[in-house]
């Protein structure tokens, strides 16, 4: 064992990201992907059918469902959420000082 101090993080995103801004974006992408995945599961369709419904290829949907979020921009996920019939709302507040 080493005597190096243990670093703690507020969330998994803070641990993975290099900056707080990047962590926030990763968290938002994960939330959108989870909601889209839940919507797709509720359709009871094959991945190919669900992908067609979303306007993407089956391999692309598979990436989304497997959590390969680095392959999706926030904009793309927002568009997919809308195609999945989800209402995406944005709330803007002042950050804590």
What spans do the regions from the language model cover?
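Short alpha-helical DNA-recognition segment
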Residues: 45-62
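Amphipathic alpha-helical interface surfaces
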Residues: 28, 32, 57-60, 73-76
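DNA major-groove recognition helix of helix-turn-helix/homeodomain DNA-binding modules
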Residues: 74-90
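Short, charged recognition helix plus adjacent turn
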Residues: 92-97
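Short basic helix-loop element that most often maps to the first helix and adjoining turn
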Residues: 32-49
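DNA major-groove recognition helix of helix-turn-helix
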Residues: 65
């Amino acid at each position: 064992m080493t005597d190096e101090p243990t670093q703690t993080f507020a969330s998994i995103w803070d641990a993975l990201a290099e900056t707080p801004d990047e962590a926030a974006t990763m968290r938002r992408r994960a939330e959108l992907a989870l909601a889209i995945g839940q919507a797709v599961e509720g359709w009871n369709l094959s991945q190919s059918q669900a992908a067609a419904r979303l306007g993407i290829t089956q391999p692309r949907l598979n990436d989304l469902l497997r959590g390969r979020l680095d392959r999706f921009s926030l904009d793309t996920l927002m568009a997919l959420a809308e195609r999945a019939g989800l209402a995406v709302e944005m709330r803007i507040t002042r950050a804590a000082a």
